[in-house]
Amino acid sequence: MDDSRVQLWVKTDPFLLGALQIPPPEKFSMHYLRKMATYVRTRASEGCYPRLCWCMWRHIACGKLQILEETAWLYFETFLSVFERSVAESLNWAEVASTCPSSEKYEEVKSKLSVDTLKFMLFLYIQQINKISLRSPLIGNEWPSPRGRSPISDFAAQSSFYNKVWDDYSHYNFIHNHLTYILELLMEPNQLSKVSQFSHCILISAEVVTALGFVIEGTVDKNRVVNAFLDLAIWQPVQIKSGFIETLGSFSFQKLQAWIKECLVINPFGITSCIKSGTKLSWAQQVDGLNKRAKVACNTYKVPHTHRMVVMSQISKQTLAKSSKTLVDARVKIHRCSDCYIYLLSPLRSVTVEKCQNCTIVLGPVQTVLHIQMCYNVKIIAVCQRLSLLSTTNCTFHVLTPTRPLFYCGNQGVVLAPFHISYSMLEDHMAHTGLATVPNSWDRPFFFSTESSNSHIWRLLLPEEFFTFVVPFEMEGDTTEIPGGLPPAYSTSVQQRQQKIRMWQETVKDAGLTREQRKQLQAVVEMKFNEWLIKTENRHQLDSLVS
């Protein structure tokens, strides 16, 4: 094959699922990460290299980088759960963590966890994509730019906090502009001093190239098959350009860097391609009187299974309900929807809900991150690995999650509530995504911001405010109850309300009403029910279900 056909691109998941949407700690800079790289390599026998155990990362993070232990665990757990654990390993960890009899035993179990050292350092470095630079407004981008500006402004957040984690162009520019630093971070420390003067003599090991595969992949057959980065770099036709020296099993630093930059393109499976050339789905109705048309696009029919994506925008004044192979393991973005009910009842890879208002969104299990940002008066119901919130107002979240809900900045009026639905395939979908009913940390938020956890930011839903929620669709499957059940206080509240209903029914039954009186009572009840439907805006949901 002609080596000119090799294309490399930046993976979506490390940025979409791994880059926490807040400026990174000050000591995640290159200076301190280089020190960390030297430290871990010189302490390989102590659990630092080639795999970094939790105890040593905690020591480095708290003692050297001066971040809190719970923040150190957040980064470690995010990398481990999203990028290293299989579905079976996730279910096994859930069982182990939930059966620990004490906090001491839990810490003992955690001490046995480890991550790939080089990939984890790269994971820490890419947190810089959300770094706020005071110089950037002054210096601007390189001109003329080697790549155009991203055309997805209609779908990306164009606010004070720009949503770079979805933007393929931001991913491309970050890796292209920081490639030298990344290679320096991953290489042997004793090679670092030679970079400026003897870069042509420096060799990069195969394990470094393997680590680069955390953020880079590619193809040689026009995207029909996706190849690991190392496999492409050692492919015989490109060895001269990639700098691979087969007898040494190493790469020339200078040639490898030049080859990557030459072959690097915008991700052909990213959101840009999905919007521009993906399949347009007719899932949503077009509502008269609205300025913008509802849009649903996917790349499912054109990409490998592991790169699926669905983008939904401008859904308004309707109910959209789907359980589809198109959604299975897809990264889903729901953008600028309003006054609607959305049911996506399939196992999902990740979900982002952005700039929506007055919506109820019911999701199948989300294998990784469910992220909500810049939404108003939205209700989300889901099982997920992690829930994260940024700049939300008056939103309610009924979630089952093994990790603490992550609060970034700008949230107000958040209500956390227990997960309270079931549908026939729910437990099968949970098993598919590696999510269990325990542990469940839905009511223990973690504030990864400078804001305090006072009452105007969040509260728990009061048991007397709690009502069950029925998914109004029939599916084949075995789930008939809420997985894990309800917390005792909420279960008691439901039982008390049901008891009052039974008592009222008995009262009516024993009242000895005539047939005419029963008709009158029924008419009054129906009238009051219709008034309630209109007042709560549930009438719209019923009407849209019928249509």
Curated annotation (Swiss-Prot):
Family matches, as Pfam families: TBCC
Bilayer-crossing regions: none
GO cellular component: a single term: centrosome
Protein name: TBCC domain-containing protein 1
Keywords from the UniProt entry: Cytoplasm, Cytoskeleton
Compartments reported by the entry: Cytoplasm, Cytoskeleton, Microtubule organizing center, Centrosome; Cytoplasm, Cytoskeleton, Spindle pole
PROSITE patterns assigned: C_CAP_COFACTOR_C (PS51329)
Family that this chain belongs to: Belongs to the TBCC family.
SUPFAM superfamilies listed in its UniProt record: C-terminal domain of adenylylcyclase associated protein (SSF69340)
Domain C-CAP/cofactor C-like intervals: 304-435
Record-linked PANTHER family: TBCC DOMAIN-CONTAINING PROTEIN 1
Described function: May play a role in the regulation of centrosome and Golgi apparatus positioning.
InterPro entries: C-CAP_CF_C-like, CAP/MinC_C, CAP_C_sf, CARP_motif, TBCC1, Tubulin-bd_cofactor_C_dom
Superkingdom of this protein's organism: Eukaryota
